[in-house]
Amino acid sequence: MMIGNLHVFPNGRIERERKPKCARCRNHGLVSWLKGHKRHCKYKECACEKCNLIAERQRVMAAQVALKRRQATEDAIALGLRVVAGQAIDRLPQGPVWNTAGGEDEDMDYLDEEIEEKPPTPVSEELVPLKRKKVEETYELSSFSPIELLMTLFCEHEKHVLELVLEACHGNVLQAIEHFANVRRVKNINQMKLFAAATRMDHVFPNMTNFILPKQSFLIDSLLEQPTFPVSSQASTSTKTCDSSSVDSISPNSSTFESS
């Protein structure tokens, strides 16, 4: 229950709403509300021992905040990789950015004023469906099993090969993807080397294919055909003379036939 700036508990205890105060003014015995006070603080250039201690503490706090924000970003990236890899997550892990102690509030009063938060940018209605679409695509990727994801990315390999490599990687999908990506890269490099060597040989020996490749296709029937040899003119005339003499020898008008 709230009454003005007072918070009333059920047991009747009243607690005022806490407002951060300027630490530099507090060191010099003044009480100043921190909101909108940074530019007008008359002790902002003070170099006394207490104010120097506050400045050093502010630098340490700023470094801690930057470290926690970077850790939260890395956790978000790791969580996205887990979702893409298809690993089941029961609940979202608590990031280190939320593990801030309550006793540091007074030390960070002045720091809160120095760290200027960016105003929230208005989100147009056109960008909202795009964000929802990205979330839906992430959920669709998480529905793939590891072996299905590998089969989608490396369809040139057989399924049992993908299963063996995934088993050798102890179920680590990212390691299996890296392995197959390296295999594909080496294969492409070898193909490029072979193509370059063939192109080089073609430039050096342009007629090499005429000696290697036959001009006509080989048929087994060509072995069964009787070879034809070229016959000279003298051989042809002698052959004709022999044929005519043999015919005359057995002709019915010959003397041999009459004597018989």
From Swiss-Prot:
**The DMA domain, residue ranges:** 144-180
Low complexity bias spans: 244-260
Molecular functions per Gene Ontology = DNA-binding transcription factor activity, RNA polymerase II-specific; metal ion binding; RNA polymerase II cis-regulatory region sequence-specific DNA binding; ubiquitin binding
Q: Does the keyword Zinc apply?
A: yes
Q: What is its main location?
A: nucleus
Q: Gene3D superfamilies attached here?
A: DM DNA-binding domain
GO CC annotation:
nucleus
Q: Which residues bind DNA?
A: 22-69
Subcellular location(s) of the protein? Nucleus
| Sorted UniProt keywords | Developmental protein, DNA-binding, Metal-binding, Nucleus, Transcription, Transcription regulation, Zinc
Q: How does it assemble?
A: Monomer. May interact with ubiquitin; the interaction may stabilize dmd-4, especially in neurons.
Which family does the entry's similarity section mention?
Belongs to the DMRT family.
Name it: Doublesex- and mab-3-related transcription factor dmd-4
